[in-house]
Amino acid sequence: MMNLGSLSLSTSKSSKPMVSISFWIPYFTHWGESLLVCGSAPGLGSGNVKKGLLLKPSQQDDQLIWSGSVSVPPGFSSDYCYYVVDDSKSVLRSEFGMKRKLVVPETLTGGESVHLRDLWQSGDQALPFRSAFKDVIFHHSFDVKVEKPLGVFMNKSDQDDSVVVQFKICCPDIGEGTSVYVLGTPEKLGNWKVENGLRLNYVDDSIWEADCLIPKADFPIKYRYCKVQKEDSIGFESGGNRELSLHSIGSKQEYIVMSDGLFRAMPWRGAGVAVPMFSVRSEDDVGVGEFLDLKLLVDWAVDSGLHLVQLLPVNDTSVHKMWWDSYPYSSLSVFALHPLYLRVQALSERLPEDIKEEIQKAKNQLDKNDVDYEATMETKLSIAKKIFDIEKDQTLNSSTFQKFFSENEGWLKPYAAFCFLRDFFETSDHSQWGTFSDYTDDKLEKLISKDNLHYNTICFHYYIQYHLHVQLSAAAEYARKKGVVLKGDLPIGVDRNSVDTWVYRNLFRMNTSTGAPPDYFDKNGQNWGFPTYNWEEMSKDNYAWWRARLTQMGKYFTAYRIDHILGFFRIWELPAHAMTGLVGKFRPSIPLSQEELEKEGIWDFDRLSKPYIQKKFLEEKFGDFWPFIASNFLNETQKDMYEFKEDCNTEKKIVAKLKSLAEKSLLLENEDKVRRDVFDILRNVVLIKDPEDARKFYPRFNIEDTSSFQDLDDHSKNVLKRLYYDYYFQRQEDLWRKNALKTLPALLNSSNMLACGEDLGLIPSCVHPVMQELGLVGLRIQRMPSESDVKFGIPSNYDYMTVCAPSCHDCSTLRAWWEEDEERRQQYFKEVIGVDGIPPSQCIPEITHFILRQHVEAPSMWAIFPLQDMMALKEEYTTRPATEETINDPTNPKHYWRYRVHVTLDSLLKDTDLKSTIKNLVSSSGRSVPANVSGEDINKSRGEVIANGSTKPNP
């Protein structure tokens, strides 16, 4: 039987003296949960949590302490981590951040006792080690020279009346020439005087530590960490004093290791700019923003006091070979980059004059108000092909290309083959590719063989991806050196006709479609057309596809936005034949069972789950036109009651029928209006029957809006209303929480990028606690408050673990929003700005300045503004109609994503007034600003860190 809380590596035959290692950590658990420590060495489970050391709980003052011990030989070393487990030792939660390191010095002779006093590492405490901070913003703190090995004790516990205490603190943001001290009540800690305090040594990964011999009589002790700069300025950590008491110290030689987590300071805050890659304009680009334009954008960001540049997805979307592909969230490949962003003149240093002239001509022709997607793609690929024909042998035989190919061939070869087959069959629908519809590795190798006549075409796709990689890598490295975080975007889905669904068909539910229920963006819901993920299948290889996807993204970006993070809790799943997003169901979810409904007196399931169509409804909706609708779409089942005909009983069939009627000139009414009205009749249901189990049902969203519901008796209405609210707002919470805690860590552990979640829309109550637990940064848009009882968000009330913004790419810009609604404008002017009277009809620079100042002064970690909203600070940039600056219209599934900034980055870089205005806004709010090219200090408030377990800045 296991001895709870203790473990020994010694055997009965061994007489070697052992060192006792005791673990001690405060952590509040729920009923049925325990804490366990697992490490890489055999004594701590060899990485197998089931074999780890189970800790035992005890109440000490107001803390629940978990402790246990293990006996190890001197020289023992191991990584270790704490886990929350259930009774069967299955992991419920684990710590975040880097693994802890345990090193038992060889200088110990055995018989000593080492007490590890740890603190749980939560998700937000791991943020300083994400690449956005470690490699970009705080990179100077990780370049400090190591002064001593980790874990070595500089003092020996050879006095019975004293204890060696090793103090250990993480300082992710440390200035040049700055030292870290611990000061406190005992004499060895200087009696609070820095000149007599204990100076810590840097031991790597922003960890500072030192030890001293403290008399037992001095305990309990109080202490705090501080930073001391060359000029003797002292910066104490915020918060109260730390305390250390001796609880169970015996007569052995005692060592205590105090791992005190993060240096407590005012939370670090920064600002950034958001703009789609295609929207950027420069003097060098051809028709669209290009990866190399990011260098100019980074320079502008640095000059404007901004630490971050945020882009929309940049993966290849070339599914249809037309402007529909301008939609950046419908990936042809989640690994390949989009040829749209290629700078063709950078493909070679020896371009022939005729190609140079062709590029210049293309620049002039494509320098339009908006992106001409089709012309730009055609032109760039045509020019790139001519350069490829000249450069291919030299490029494909180069060591840099060979290295790129060997590191990326797992996705690059299927991508090139897919592009060839797409063009050969003139469709991306791989179900139409005959023998190639079913992917196999053997078929792939034959397709890309050097012996094929089309091998040159395959190599062209390799060539394009190689140069896109080179150009984006150069821009990414430039941003890192400038102290600017490059933030990418992770789409929630992939296109149904994509490389990924071709190669990994088992990972997708191809008979379904992904969307979102009705919300701020669209009252009818959204249908994005992506197949939903088969999470059960993905889990079998520990989410290898996701891990590869995030690893690839991490080559270029140091932060990323998780599009529709709610999809990792539950997704709004629609049948593949649906075109709108209203009649869906959540997956996973607990449906209403037939037995459950029958117990409530609900029996007529056909009545509730089939479209409820009465003659009077047809007359109300279509007027005199109703007989035409009835004769073409419906069958009469009984007097004045109808059902849909077999050839038009889905949304896709209805669209096909309407198209046929229009072609025959039989449709006299507006086709779009008729389609919407017929869709309304089709969706006039109360319950949606599960397509895989006829005894399970889902309440239709906005159930009370349907005439089918309104025509029910009061008893049925009351029952169904109660079950509706239970389904959507109560019964799923625990299921969705557990689902997110399985899927999201797979993403977070796949790369070192800083993860931000887009948590807008219909938010289950489990979402924000899980995001906080995982250290995910949320999103707050002022016009879309997460609180249901307010119309406008209050930035000063936002949590620290958020990005705040006045608008985003899925809604109108600040200027357009201001002009859209007079009543709302008046309300905002009075309630938020605090001014009575009539507001200006346009969002003048003074109003823009007020709104941006509101946001930079918010507690949020990041304030990220669309470039259009920043340009609205200056009147000369507001001459373009505000409505033309909108990037996306979520209500239009065929929106053309083509917005281009009407001013070049070259011009913006010369505009010192705008840059100065933005930089002053940022710096005056206490947010960090990057160092300029002359190397001035990054900011005045040196020593800021990520909030230590806090959701708001300390006062």
Curated annotation (Swiss-Prot):
GO-annotated molecular function: 4-alpha-glucanotransferase activity; heteropolysaccharide binding; starch binding
Xref: SMART domains: CBM_2 (SM01065)
Any one Gene Ontology cellular component term annotated for this protein: cytosol
Disruption phenotype: Dwarf plants with yellowish leaves that accumulate large amounts of maltose. Increased tolerance to cold.
Species: Arabidopsis thaliana
Protein family: Belongs to the disproportionating enzyme family.
Subcellular location(s) per record: Cytoplasm, Cytosol
The keyword Cell inner membrane belongs to this UniProt entry's keyword annotation: no
Catalysed conversion reaction: Transfers a segment of a (1->4)-alpha-D-glucan to a new position in an acceptor, which may be glucose or a (1->4)-alpha-D-glucan
Induction: Circadian-regulation with a peak in expression in the middle of the light period.
Residue ranges of the TM segments: none
Keywords: Acetylation, Carbohydrate metabolism, Cytoplasm, Glycosyltransferase, Repeat, Transferase
Modified residues (N-acetylmethionine): 1
Region annotated Disordered, chain positions: 925-955
Subcellular location, principal: cytoplasm
Name assigned to this protein: 4-alpha-glucanotransferase DPE2
EC number: 2.4.1.25
